Amino acid sequence: MAPRDAWLARWLPLIGERAAGLPVFELGCGGGRDSEVLAAAGHQVVGVDLSGKAIANARGRVPSATFHCQDIRAPFPVERAGVVIASLSLHYFPWPETEALADRIRQLLLPSGVLLCRLNSTNDRHFGASGHPRIDDDYYMVDGEPKRFFDRAATQRLFARDWRALSLDERVIDRYDQPKCVWETVLERAD
């Protein structure tokens, strides 16, 4: 049986090309679902997540990886990366903080490095894109947590400076009990 939400499979050749012998750095690694895929493909992985419980689960799931319990806005535990993964982890912050985080990721990457990123879509009706208290445009308080939702223009605006989009698609993923709509983008550092 294929794993649910096997989104990284199609990107493994690119990840292999761009990792440049460095660990793949995963922002918001959760319980290690994507870290496990990366490690199984032969990559060293360094992951960070705010949840101590998620980090404990990730360590149990992928003992070969290195995990840090920290806010993704804190200083990164790696100095350089060829590949950064940020799946559903960049949408919790006010717009200026999100932009600053995208810039820090770009600075972390090698000149040929890539970011594989998934963001909540404004079409993600099952997971908070409507019916919640508004904080700002497309930014809501959902079950006690701020969540930002992106359309194509917002995704492009976030990565407009010194990034080259290799792929940008709105997708429905099979990760939870309900279908979830996300923007999946693969970006190359372009400065």
Where in this protein do the model-derived segments appear?
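Class I (Rossmann-like) S-adenosyl-L-methionine-dependent methyltransferase catalytic domain
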Residues: 1-25, 30-77, 100, 114-191
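A short glycine-rich, Lys/Arg-flanked "PGG" loop and its adjoining helix->strand segment in the class I
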Residues: 99-111
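Short catalytic micro-motifs in class I SAM-dependent methyltransferases
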Residues: 88-92
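A conserved beta-strand element that flanks and buttresses the S-adenosyl-L-methionine
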Residues: 85
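Short, conserved catalytic or interaction motifs in soluble domains
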Residues: 95
